[in-house]
Amino acid sequence: MKEEMIQRFTSYVKVDTQSDADKESCPSTEGQLNLARQLVEEMKSIGIQEVTMDENGYVMGTIPSNTDKDVPTIGFLAHIDTATDFTGKNVKPQLHENYQGGDITLNEDLHIVLSPTQFPNLQKYQGHTLITTDGTTLLGADNKAGIAEIMTAMHYLIEHPEIKHGKIRVAFTPDEEIGRGPHKFDVEAFGASYAYTIDGGPLGELQYESFNAAGAKVSIKGNNVHPGTAKDKMVSAAKIGMLFHNKLPSDESPEYTEGYEGFFHLTKFVGEVEEAELQYIIRDFDKDKFNDRKALFEKIASDLKAIYGENSINLKIQDQYYNMREKIEPVKHIVDIAHEAMENRSVTPVIEPIRGGTDGSQLSYKGLPTPNIFTGGENFHGKYEFISVENMVKATEVIVEIARLFEEKA
């Protein structure tokens, strides 16, 4: 299973599948379709049935039930795209067998080193086979590790019919990293009662709580006048943007928050005298606090309009997804089964909130309760991303065990 996992994963990461928030198409990039087509052929070759890919790049397939019991149909999902935070073009995965601790040189020429001094968790992986980048790209374990783990698990179930299970559906989705993964996902066609995204981080992660999330765009109009004659005439849009931002609590940003704490995050600020634009993401686990955060944006905009004019500021806030806990708690047994599956495979479950979102956040509100399970990777979205092959195998074992437990408990 280990060699099969390495071959699959390294094949997937070499395909550039970064999504693009500036594109309106679905998927947003051609590279995602390239990998989707590759997955379709591979799924057929290993015996997955009813394999489909629609015009939007959503790939689905079926492992038929092999039991007489009436077992709920379950699904496993991963996303095809990789993050936009760092380049994902020409990924060159590096294999480090039997890691012995200490620094890992990713790129000698560029002096890029993955060090436990900077990333203390690295020391936990002594004896593991690690896959890293070459220091010039991200790796793409988020979420190609999930794809590899699902594919390997499905292949294992097909090759081992003695493991009884109900009907299983798998899906690989585009554009998760830009928040659109479930937008065109056909829940009815997928036909599962419950599902799991394989999109978490380190070994044991089991998550059924996510942020409530919104995006905000603040567009500001100023008035540019020659600075030599600007007194009482010039209005600097850039300065108004600074005023707007400084009215937000300075300690409620990502670098100062953890656990269940929410935040405001300024992701982009471009400005000059004539016009400026600020883009934010707004996050909180608590629905009331989430609404309070959005209300604060409205108040700041209103206060500044009172000073600079009604047309000086245009604020747009759009909800992106909600805390999936509300939809999963009524069917908490699906979390309990994942918890038991991990313990059965000698994995210690680590239940914690997702300080982010997954496709499951939105799918849960579309009628498909979908908690999230670990992939085994760390340091996603950057050049220091790495993953343990042994922990990828554990994720595959947990997927197989979840399928077995649903049949056993039916």
Curated annotation (Swiss-Prot):
Chief site of localization: cytoplasm
Binding site for Zn(2+) 2: D142, E177, H381
Cell location: Cytoplasm
Annotated GO CC locations: cytosol
A Pfam family the protein falls into: Peptidase_M20
Reaction catalysed by this enzyme: Release of the N-terminal residue from a tripeptide
Residues annotated as catalytic: D81, E176
Binding site for Zn(2+) 1: H79, D142, D199
NCBIfam families: peptidase-T, PRK05469.1, PRK13381.1
Protein name (database record): Peptidase T
Species of the source: Bacillus pumilus (strain SAFR-032)
Gene name tied to this protein: pepT
